[in-house]
């Protein structure tokens, strides 16, 4: 771990502006001034919620360069990847015969399957390069962990990613990416109920600001 989960989440907020920028460059998408303000307000709320620790928990701003570069790459890559996924679905949709237009609704799931195959190839290559097959085998033998991992894979990379691609079918990638960046807000209540994690006023404030920012997209 180079920069920690909170800084990692903060760098991931680069995804919405990256998606908006490259959506404009590649797809010609435009956002209204109100939508851009909504994006800024939403990301501000997320930032406040992520850095919810009190004064007794000091946060060092002296981050390693490699961690910063990986964080920026992750955030920008997430945004650009969403734009490229939409481009791929647009090309495929344009090639579908008129009598098969009903299959358009299945495009996000087909695109998710393609992304999953590519991801699997990438992870296998990474395991080969780093020589971690023994640790991978040990993880597979942990039944409880594999059970939870299976459910996490089903709800996240399958259902979550498919719905995210469905979202970009019907709205601009910048708006869809901003809504997807709300994960740190959505996990506040489950983390409190399931793991008894205390909820601070800064988390609540960040959630309220984020909800207000999202509302600007729809009013």
Sequence positions of predicted segments:
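Alpha-helical transmembrane segments of compact multi-pass small-molecule transporters, enriched
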Residues: 11-25, 118, 122, 159-160, ...
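Membrane-helix interface motif
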Residues: 78-97
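Signature of the 12-TM Major Facilitator Superfamily
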Residues: 6-10, 33, 110-113, 175-178, ...
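Short amphipathic alpha-helical coupling elements at transmembrane boundaries
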Residues: 1, 9-12, 138, 210
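Interfacial helix-capping/hinge residues at the ends of transmembrane alpha-helices
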Residues: 8, 23, 82-86, 164-165, ...
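Membrane-interface interhelical linkers
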Residues: 1-3, 44, 51-72, 76, ...
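Juxtamembrane helix-loop boundary signature in multi-pass membrane transporters
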Residues: 17-76, 80, 192, 198, ...
């Amino acid at each position: 771990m180079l920069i920690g989960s909170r800084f990692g989440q903060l760098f991931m907020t680069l995804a919405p502006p990256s998606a908006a920028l490259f959506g404009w460059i590649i797809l010609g998408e435009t956002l209204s001034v109100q939508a851009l303000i909504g994006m800024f307000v939403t990301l501000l709320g997320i930032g406040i919620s992520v850095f919810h620790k009190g004064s007794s928990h000091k946060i060092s701003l002296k981050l390693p360069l490699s961690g910063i570069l990986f964080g920026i790459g992750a955030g920008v890559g997430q945004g650009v990847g969403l734009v490229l996924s939409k481009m791929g679905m647009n090309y495929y949709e344009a090639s579908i015969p008129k009598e098969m237009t009903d299959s358009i609704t299945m495009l996000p799931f087909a695109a998710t399957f393609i992304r999953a195959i590519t991801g699997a190839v990438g992870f296998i290559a990474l395991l080969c390069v780093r020589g971690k097959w023994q640790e991978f085998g040990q993880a597979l033998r942990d039944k409880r962990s594999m059970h939870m991992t299976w459910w996490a894979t089903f709800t996240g990379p399958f259902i979550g990613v498919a719905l995210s691609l469905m979202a970009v079918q019907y709205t601009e990638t910048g708006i869809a990416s901003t809504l997807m960046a709300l994960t740190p807000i959505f996990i506040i209540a489950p983390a409190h109920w399931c793991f008894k994690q205390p909820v601070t006023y800064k988390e609540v404030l960040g959630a309220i600001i984020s909800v207000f920012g999202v509302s600007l997209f729809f009013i």
